[in-house]
Regions:
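An amphipathic, aromatic/His-enriched active-site/gating alpha helix that lines ligand/cofactor pockets
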Residues: 35-41, 86-121, 198, 204, ...
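Elongated alpha-helical scaffolds
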Residues: 51-68, 73-98, 102-106, 306, ...
Length: 431
C-alpha cells in the first residue's frame, strides 16, 4: 500500500505584484479556475502521483472586521501551492521542482525573498506550512489505481448488455467471460491492474507511535485539565456569550466570482481563511482540538468517511502567522450548497469544534451547540471567508468518490474463483 500525503508551500506576495501574479495564474486554466493539465507554466498532468493541486492567493477579505477593540491586523498576502499526492510530500515537492522548475520560478518570482537562481526544491521545503490536521478519504488509493480501475470499468461496461439476465447461471457465465476478457486485455497491455506496492515500514512505525503518543500525552494532561476544568468552563462560556458575530451576506460581486469557479466538474474546490480569536485560551483550545481532529482522521476516518460525511477527497487545516490565522482547503464532490448542507445536517458539531474559534463565527453554546446550526449565519460566514482558487487541478476529472468506490469493487470482484449466483449478479450490476 502506498500512503498519501499533503503539502502546503506558502510565501508572501511582493507588494505591488499581486495583479501580475493573478494574470499569470489565469493563463494556466482551460476553464475558470480549472487547470489545463498540459499548461505551459506548470503541467500538473505529467506528475503521475499527484491527485489534486491548487494555487491560490490568500488575500484575507475579513482582516478589516472590527471586534474585541483591537487594532486592525496588517498581515501579508500569501501565495499558496497545495498538493495531495501518493508517497511522501518531500518527494513530490522535489519532483515538482525538478520537472517543472522553469514554471515554478516564474510563479514564485512574485514572492518576497525568492532567488530565481537558487535551489528551488530547498526554497520550497523552507517555505512549507505545517498542517495542523490532515484528512485523506481512502488511505492507500493511488492515482494509478484510480485511473486503471476507471479504464477497467469503461472496458467492461462496453461489453455488457443492459438487458436483464434470465438466471443466475447466465450471470455466472457472463462473469467468467468478462474475467477472460480482462485477462486478455491485461496480457495485451490495453488494461493495467498493477498490484499495490509494499507499505513502507517507516510509515507503519510512525503511525503506531502517533497512535500511542497522543493518548499518552492526553493522560498526562488529564489531571491538570480536571483541576482547571471549572476555570476553563467559565472562560469558555464567558467568551461564547460575549464573542462578536460577524455574518453579513457576502458581497454580490465576490460571490459571483466564487461561483464562476465552481461546478466545472463533478468535484469542486474550497479554500477559506480567517483570523483566530485573540487570547491564549482560544489559541490553545483550537490547537488541541485540531490535534484531536488530526488523530481521528489518521487512525479512525481512513476508509471513505469524515464522521458521517462521504464526499471529501482530501482536506487540511493549517495555521498562519504564528497561529493568528487559519486556512482550510478541501476537494469535495457535488455543489457548494450541497456540501454545506451535508455538514450542517450531519456534523454541525464538528464544524463548531474546528471553526468556532474564528473571529465572527456564529455564537456557540458549550462549544458544539448552535453555531453552524444557525444555517443562514453559518452560510454567510463561510462564503465571506472563502477565497477564489485561481488554479485547481484534479487528476481524474469526471470521477466522484462514489465512482472510485464502485470501480474498486469491480476490480475486487474479479479476484474470487467462485461466487454465488447472487454475488455474480450484484457484481454485474456495478457495470
Amino acid at each position: 500500500m502506498t500512503p498519501q500525503s499533503q503539502f502546503l508551500v506558502l510565501a508572501p506576495v511582493t507588494p505591488g505584484r499581486e495583479r501580475d501574479l493573478r494574470a499569470l495564474l489565469a493563463t494556466m486554466n482551460s476553464a475558470p479556475g480549472m487547470a489545463d493539465p498540459a499548461n505551459a507554466v506548470l503541467a500538473f498532468g505529467q506528475f503521475e502521483r499527484l491527485h489534486f493541486a491548487r494555487l491560490a492567493v490568500l488575500d484575507d477579505p475579513t482582516l478589516s472586521d472590527e471586534a474585541y477593540d483591537l487594532p486592525r491586523q496588517s498581515l501579508p498576502v500569501y501565495l499558496a501551492l497545495t498538493g495531495s499526492c501518493d508517497g511522501p510530500a518531500d518527494e513530490c515537492i522535489s519532483d515538482l521542482a525538478r520537472r517543472a522548475g522553469t514554471g515554478l520560478r516564474r510563479i514564485f518570482a512574485h514572492c518576497d525573498g525568492f532567488d530565481a537562481g537558487g535551489d528551488l526544491a530547498a526554497w520550497m521545503q523552507a517555505h512549507r506550512g505545517r498542517l495542523a490536521a490532515n484528512y485523506i478519504n481512502w488511505v492507500g488509493r493511488t492515482v494509478r489505481q484510480v485511473k486503471e480501475e476507471g479504464a477497467l470499468h469503461r472496458a467492461l461496461a462496453a461489453k455488457v448488455s443492459r438487458a436483464l439476465l434470465a438466471s443466475g447461471a447466465q450471470a455466472q457465465e457472463l462473469r467468467r467471460e468478462l474475467i477472460d476478457f480482462v485477462d486478455t486485455e491485461v496480457s495485451a497491455g490495453r488494461l493495467g491492474l498493477t498490484p499495490p506496492d509494499p507499505t513502507p515500514v517507516g510509515w507503519w512505525i510512525a503511525k503506531l507511535l502517533h497512535l500511542l503518543w497522543i493518548p499518552l500525552v492526553g493522560l498526562v494532561l488529564l489531571p491538570f485539565l480536571i483541576v482547571l476544568s471549572p476555570l476553563l468552563i467559565y472562560l469558555l462560556r464567558a467568551k461564547e456569550e460575549s464573542d462578536a458575530e460577524i455574518c453579513p451576506p457576502q458581497d454580490r460581486a465576490a460571490l459571483l466570482e466564487l461561483q464562476r469557479l465552481e461546478d466545472h466538474d463533478v468535484s469542486n474546490q474550497y479554500t477559506a481563511i480567517g483570523s483566530v480569536k485573540p487570547g491564549l485560551f482560544r489559541r490553545w483550545l483550537v490547537s488541541g482540538l485540531l490535534v484531536a481532529v488530526n488523530y481521528t482522521a489518521r487512525h479512525v476516518f481512513t476508509r471513505g468517511f469524515l464522521a458521517r460525511v462521504q464526499t471529501i477527497h482530501f482536506a487540511f487545516w493549517a495555521f498562519l502567522d504564528d497561529k493568528r490565522r487559519l486556512v482550510f482547503t478541501s476537494n469535495y464532490d457535488g455543489g457548494h450548497e450541497a456540501y454545506m448542507d451535508d455538514f450542517i445536517n450531519k456534523v454541525a458539531w464538528g464544524l463548531n469544534l474546528s471553526f468556532s474559534h474564528g473571529v465572527g463565527w456564529p455564537r456557540t453554546r458549550w462549544l458544539v451547540a448552535r453555531g453552524a446550526r444557525i444555517e443562514s449565519k453559518f452560510k454567510n460566514y463561510q462564503r465571506r471567508h472563502q477565497l477564489p482558487t485561481e488554479v485547481w487541478y484534479k487528476a481524474y476529472p469526471g470521477l466522484a468518490l462514489a465512482d472510485l468506490k464502485r470501480n474498486q469493487r469491480i476490480r475486487e470482484g474479479l479476484e474470487p474463483v467462485r461466487v454465488t449466483d447472487a454475488e455474480a449478479e450484484a457484481w454485474l450490476r456495478l457495470l
